[in-house]
Design a protein with these regions (language model features):
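Extreme N-terminal starter segment of soluble prokaryotic enzymes
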Residues: 1-4
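Short, surface-exposed acidic-centric catalytic microdomains
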Residues: 21-61
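Short amphipathic alpha-helices and their capping/turn segments at secondary-structure boundaries
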Residues: 22-36, 74-89
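Divalent-metal-activated hydrolytic enzyme cores
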Residues: 43, 52-55, 60-83, 111-137
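N-terminal glycine-rich phosphate/adenylate-binding segment common to multiple enzyme folds
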Residues: 78-107
Length: 137
């Protein structure tokens, strides 16, 4: 199987704070599969570390109000275009790009709401199986 994976889950330091979300469960799940690391924020040129972003009324913005929506959506489109034969995606929970079940509410207060990040939603809309990392066995 060819699996798209949030790069931070593989130990890449691409989180907004310069860290990662390395997950032994993800590494175990991926054994024997072709792995494609993805980080829309880095692909969009947002850098690491970077100002946090959240979805604010449908638009991805930085904490200081700058829209990065166009760049992120272009990065998402590129990921889909370059990986038409991926079988599924394992994505980081609560991320504004990768969140599968919940994302932060856009107030930068730490409050969660039901919803999907822009990459997760685009993958789902394109018919990919999208898995929240927290749902792995």
């Amino acid at each position: 199987m060819k699996i798209l994976v949030s790069a931070c889950l593989l130990g890449r330091n691409c989180k907004y704070n310069g860290g990662n979300n390395h997950s032994a469960a993800v590494i175990d799940f991926l054994q024997g599969h072709e792995v494609i690391p993805v980080c829309p924020e880095v692909l969009a040129g947002l850098g690491t570390p970077r100002t946090p972003v959240e979805i604010v009324q449908g638009e991805v913005k930085t904490k200081d109000g700058k829209s990065v929506d166009k760049a992120l959506r272009q990065a998402v489109a590129q990921i889909l275009e370059e990986n038409p034969d991926a079988d599924c995606a394992v994505l980081k929970s609560r991320s504004p790009t990768c969140g599968v079940k919940q994302v932060y509410d856009g107030t930068f207060s730490g409050k969660l709401v039901d919803g999907m990040g822009v990459l997760a939603q685009a993958l789902k809309d394109a018919g990919y199986r999208v898995i929240d990392v927290e749902d792995l066995p």
